[in-house]
Amino acid sequence: MINTCALKNYLEKSQKKESPAKETIVTSLNRSLSTPPSHLEGILLINKPKGKTSFSLVRDLRKRLGVKKIGHAGTLDPFATGVMVMLVGRNYTRLSDQFLLSDKEYIAEAYLGVVTDSYDCEGQVLSQSNIIPTLEQIKEAFSLFQGKIEQVPPMFSAKKQQGKKLYELARQGIVVERQPVKISIHTELLSYNYPYLNFRIECSKGTYIRSIAYDLGTKLGCGAHLSNLTRTRSGAFCLENCLNGAEIHTVTNLEQNLIRND
C-alpha cells in the first residue's frame, strides 16, 4: 500500500511503466496547488469491485471522508473491476482532464460466438455463431490490433452526436453512423479456451475495450462480446497499490492512504 507521500515524487520515482501524460500531470499539479492542500485532499487508489458503479464509489467516499468535491480519472462499467484513480478535494478534481489523458492497461476476456448490442455481457444478444476459430486464426487476428489504428465508438457510449449521447440514442433503438477515432494499442494473447479468449491490452485515451472484443469477433467471423474486464494500470498507478473498494467503509484511517503533493 502507498502511504501518504508527495505525488510529484511518486510519479517521478515510480518504477512502474510511465504514462505519456506524466509530465503534463506534474506540471499541472505545480500550477494548481498554489495553496497547501488540506489533509483531506489527494489521490486515493481504489480497486473497484464487480457490480458497483463508478459513481457509487464517489458517493461512498463522500460519505466516508465528508468531502463533497470527489471525482475520478476514468470510469469503469459495473461488471468491470480494477484501478479507479479517485480525486479528492478541489485541487485534485480540477486535474481530472489531465489524468484522463493517461494511457491504461487492462486484462480482458472476450466471449466468442455471441454478439450483443452493447458489445459486452450486459447487453441483449443479437446473434450467435457455431464457428470455432483456430489458435492460428486467433493469433492472426491479434496481429491486426497493434500500434495506431482507427476504432469506431460503440453506440452504447457517452460520446455525443446530434447533441445527444450515443447511449441515449441506442436506448431509443436509434443507430447512427459514427466516425472512427485514432487510438494507439498493444495487445497480447494470454490464453484461448473456446469460447473464452483472454488478452492484455495497453491503450491510449478513448479506447473502448468493448469495441476491441467486438472487432476481434468480426475479424474471426464468429462474433464476440466483452465478458470480463480488469483495469490493471491507469497512468503510473497500478492495481497492486489499490485499496479494496468493497472495504471502504471498514478501512481505518482511510485518509492516510491519500497520495498528495505536500
Swiss-Prot record:
InterPro entries: PsdUridine_synth_cat_dom_sf, PsdUridine_synth_N, tRNA_psdUridine_synth_TruB, TruB_C
Keywords per UniProt: Isomerase, tRNA processing
Single annotated GO MF: RNA binding
Pfam families for the chain: TruB_C_2, TruB_N
Taxonomic superkingdom: Bacteria
Keyword Transmembrane helix applies: no
Active site per database record: 77 (nucleophile)
Cross-referenced Gene3D superfamilies: Pseudouridine synthase
Purpose of the protein: Responsible for synthesis of pseudouridine from uracil-55 in the psi GC loop of transfer RNAs.
Record protein name field: tRNA pseudouridine synthase B
Record organism: Protochlamydia amoebophila (strain UWE25)
Lineage: Bacteria, Pseudomonadati, Chlamydiota, Chlamydiia, Parachlamydiales
